[in-house]
Amino acid sequence: MILFRIRLLLYPSTLLLILLSACHQSSQTQSQQSSEKPPASAANPASGPAPSTSNTVAEASRPSGPIRFTDVTAQAGIHFRHNSGAFGKKYLPETMGSGVCAIDYDNDGWQDIFFVNSKNWPGHGDTKPYSALYHNNQDGTFTDVTKQAGLATEMYGLGCAVGDYDNDGHDDIYVTALDGNHLFRNLGNGKFADVTARAGVRDPGFATGAIWFDYDNDGKLDLYVSHYVDWSVATDQTCSLDTKNKSYCTPELYKGQSGTLFHNKGNGGFEDVTKKAGLYDPTGKSLGIALIDVDNDGWMDLFVTNDTQANKLYRNNHNGTFTEMALEAGVAYSDAGKKRAGMGTDAEDYDSTGRQSLVIGNFTNESLSLYHNDGSGLFSDNSVASGIASSSASSLTFSAFFFDYDLDGLPDIFAANGHVADDVSVVQPTIHYAEPPLLFHNKGHGKFDDVTDRVGTALRQPVVGRGAAYLDFDNDGDLDLVLTTSNGPAKLLRNENGNQNDMLRIKTIGTRSNRDGIGAKITVTTREGLHLFKMVKSGSSYLSQSELPVTFGLGKPRANKVVSLDIIWPSGKKESIRNVQPNQFLTLEEGKGILSQHPIDLNGAKHSETK
C-alpha cells in the first residue's frame, strides 16, 4: 500500500490526497460602417430599434442597497446534481467534479445553462445520469430540456466548451469525457445532433478542459482539448491517509497525457495537428486553459495549467505552430521555483494596462496565483502584493476567473473551492472537504480585498466546489454566478443590486472572422477617464465556460455619459464607434458596426437578441 507524504497534501486537482471580463444617431466607424440596416432574415429578423440618443435608465429605477449574491437555485427550477459514480473504491476521476457552460442555444437573447455530468461505474448503480440543458424561461426560471434537445447521452463527462464551429449562427457544445468526447451540433431548432464521429474529435483519453479559438485566423474555430493522466480502473493505485483506509491518490503516481489541437477543415471535420503545431507534451497533466494574446499581436496564444507539473504558455508563431515560453515568461512555477497544482485559470486585463494577466486556482497551502503581464512577454507573481494570497492559502481552488460583479470597471476575482479528499481532516483537522467560495473585490492599483463575508450568506456556505461560470441570466445588466459541486447539487447565485453602476453589454458577430467573434478585442473609453479592454473568449475557469457576450462596468452613473468603442476583429479588421450611450445591450457585426441595440432594464425586463 502506498502511503502519502504530507507534502503531497498540498497537491492536485483531481487529485488526491490531501491537501489537494446606442450608438448615437450619427455613430461612425473607421471602416466606413454601412448606413443601411442589414436585411431581415431567419437568422437576423431585424436590425433592432433606432439608436438611442440618451441614457434610457431612469435614476429612480436604479437598485440601491448592498450588493449580495442570493441562492435562487430552487426557485429557478434547477435540479441538476452531479454524479461521480463513487461507491467506495476511491477512483481518481471521482475527484474531478464537472463543468458548466453558459449558452444561448436558441438565440432568444437569454442565457441558458448546460451542466456536465458523469456516470456510474460498470456494475454499480441502477440510474443513468445525464448532462443537463436548462432553457431560460425569461422569468427567472429554467426548464430541463435535455431529452428533447437530444443531449441525453451517457458518458463520464467532465468539461464543456461552447462555440459556433460551423459558422451557421447557432452555438454548438463540445463535452470532454473520460471515455471519449462528444461534439453536439446545434441544429437551430432546439435540438442537437452528436456529430463526433463525422467531425473526428472523439479524442480518447482522460480529457478535461476544452477551448474554441481560431489559432490560424482563417475565420473558423479550432479546438484545443487538455488531458490529465494515463488512468484506468485496471491501473488505479492504492493510497491511504491513515494507513488503514483507501484514499484518493495524487496524480504524481500516473503518467501524463498530451493535450490535442484540432484544426477546423471547414467541411464539418477536424484534423489532429497537435504534433505539427508543436503542442505535443506527454508529460502534461492539464486541467485549465485560458485564451490569451500575450504580446497583443492579434494571434491567439494558449495558457495551460498543469497539476503537479510546470504550467505551459504557448506563443502563436503565425504559421500554424506554437513555441512554449512559460519558463522564460515567469508563469511555469511559483516564485520559489516549485511546481504547483494548477487547476482553473483565466486571462483578463485587471489593471487597465491593455494587457491580459493570469489568475490560477491551486492546491491547499499554495494560494491563488496572480501573474501580472508586465509586457514584453514577461509576467510577475503578484498574488501576495495584490492581497489575494493570504485569504486563499488554505483553500483548494478549482475554478478561478475575473468578472466585474459591481460594474465599477475593475475586474474582480471569483474562486470556487473544495478539497479532493473527503477524509482530509484525518491528517489536517483545520482543512475541510467542503469549503466556501471566495470573492475578491478589485480596489484598483493592483490591490484586491476579500469581500466574501460582505455579499450575503450564499457565498459563506461550504461546498465541494468544482466548475463555475458567470452569466447575466436575468438580463438586468449585472453578472450572476453558477457553479457545480462534486457529487452534489449545482448552485445558481443571483447578483442582487450589482447593477447600480452603468454598464455596456456587447455581443459580437464575425463575418470574415469566426461567427462568435471569439478573439475579438474591444476597448471602451469614457470621457471620465475609464479605459477598459476585454477579449471575447471561450473556455477559462475549470472545465467550464462563461457567457460569450462581454460586459463592461462603467462606474457611477453620470448625466450625458457617452463611451467610445474600438474593436479589433480576429481577421485584423479595425472599427471605431463613437457617442454610445451606456446601459445597453449592443450587437456588433464585423464590417457593419451596431447591428442592433436594446436598453437594459435594471429590473430584468425582457428583451430579445438575435444571432
Can you name each region flagged by the protein language model?
Residues 23-26:
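Bacterial signal peptide processing site
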Residues 55, 65, 86, 388-390, ...:
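Gly/Ser/Thr/Pro-enriched helix-cap/hinge segments flanking short amphipathic alpha-helices
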Residues 69-72, 141-151, 191-201, 268-280, ...:
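Blade-edge beta-strand/turn elements of extracellular beta-propeller
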Residues 78-99, 127, 149-161, 200-211, ...:
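Repeat-based blade/solenoid architectures
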Residues 97-107, 135, 156-170, 183-185, ...:
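Beta-propeller blade termini
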Residues 110-117, 168-177, 223-227, 301-306, ...:
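Hydrophobic beta-strand segments that make up the repeating blades of beta-propeller
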Residues 116-128, 227-254, 415-432:
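Short, conserved, GDST-rich strand-edge loop motifs in beta-rich repeat architectures
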Residues 131-136, 257-264, 315, 371-373, ...:
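Beta-propeller blade signature
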